[in-house]
Design a protein with these regions (language model features):
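Core subunits and conserved enzymes of cellular information-processing
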Residues: 2-242
Length: 242
């Protein structure tokens, strides 16, 4: 999985996929524990979870995540006006991520959160874990979770900078979260959408970009298994031609 290539270590794209899911899920747990506001990307799912779980105990945060990702995947296909079988693997990733998130939520329940300073530490760690996870997913050919896939595919389709596009996407998600909070919990009641959400929306794209720069400076991402053609057929065909 690791090696050396031109003064940089090589890093498996498959391992980047695993780390991406784990880091992002743990970052969300820390974010929920900090209680300064969830990230804009997960705000809609979190609000639905908080709204529905008191009435239906089987509803989990992870479940709402992959249900909403299915809707986002459909919206992406309509926007790009194309469908690939590899996109279905993004939904599989969303389901895997949902189960990992629910498992980590059980672990996170044991973390103390009595002081505001400890919660602040959780918030800072959360931002770094989530950014590291999202950036890792951007460096793997395995279909990322639908949220990352949407940012990656739509920004490429329209020729937009991926980090700036993500910041814009996050801001829109933040506004949707605020609207959902008002509808579900009452006007001017900010449930799950707080100052931490706004701060995250403004700087998350930048932090992810810094992690990407760090990764690319120290590692060369390479495939250890011949599976790229099943997930990125266009890239595989181009590589073969070269």
């Amino acid at each position: 999985m690791f090696g050396r290539s031109k003064m940089k270590r090589t890093f498996s794209t498959g391992l980047a996929y695993v780390f991406g899911i784990a880091f992002a899920a743990w970052g969300v747990v820390l974010m929920e524990k900090a209680d300064f506001g969830v990230s804009m990307a997960v705000a809609p799912a979190y609000l639905l979870y908080r709204w529905l779980s008191p009435a239906w105990s089987f509803v989990t945060f992870g479940m709402e995540e992959y249900c909403l990702r299915a809707v986002l995947l459909l919206a992406m296909c309509l926007l790009l006006w194309r469908f690939r079988v590899s996109y279905l693997f993004s939904f599989v990733t969303a389901v895997v991520y949902g189960f990992v998130l629910d498992a980590f939520m059980l672990l996170g329940a044991m973390l103390p959160a009595r002081s505001v300073w400890l919660r602040a530490i959780y918030y800072v760690l959360r931002m770094h874990f989530c950014a590291a996870g999202v950036s890792a997913m951007f460096h793997t050919y395995i279909s990322p979770e639908v949220y990352e896939l949407f940012v990656k595919e739509v920004s490429a389709h329209f020729g937009a900078d991926i980090n700036r596009f993500k910041t814009g996407y996050d801001c829109v998600s933040c506004l949707i979260g605020v609207a959902m909070s008002f509808l579900a919990f009452g006007l001017w009641h900010f449930e799950g959408v707080k100052w931490g959400t706004i701060l995250c929306a403004l700087i998350n794209g930048y932090v992810i970009g810094r992690f990407s720069t760090f990764y690319e400076k120290h590692w060369t991402f390479c495939d250890r298994f011949p599976w790229r053609k099943y997930f990125a057929p266009d890239a595989a065909a181009q590589t073969s031609a070269e």
